[in-house]
Amino acid sequence: MARRCFVTGKSAKAGNARSHSMRATRRTWGVNVQKVRILVNGKPKRVYVSTRALKSGLVTRV
């Protein structure tokens, strides 16, 4: 299962890590997702949800 937010669709982003000499190496920034039980179509389901969605009240835990 992809580490993607079920509600907002947030996923990992890629970019460059820059050293002191500005040499670039590829890296990824992960999204802070938690596996929680929420109501989906009236039934409880365990999905990955970003902490931003949890804090803002976009989902209600079961």
Curated annotation (Swiss-Prot):
Listed GO biological process terms: translation
Renumbered residue ranges of the record's region Disordered: 1-23
Pfam families for the chain: Ribosomal_L28
Top-rank taxon, per record: Bacteria
MF-aspect GO terms: structural constituent of ribosome
The entry's keywords: Ribonucleoprotein, Ribosomal protein
Keyword Ribonucleoprotein: yes
The UniProt record lists the keyword Coiled coil: no
GO cellular component, one term: ribosome
HAMAP family noted in UniProt: Ribosomal_bL28 (MF_00373)
Similarity comment text for this entry: Belongs to the bacterial ribosomal protein bL28 family.
Name by which UniProt lists this protein: Large ribosomal subunit protein bL28
Source species: Brevibacillus brevis (strain 47 / JCM 6285 / NBRC 100599)
Annotated gene: rpmB
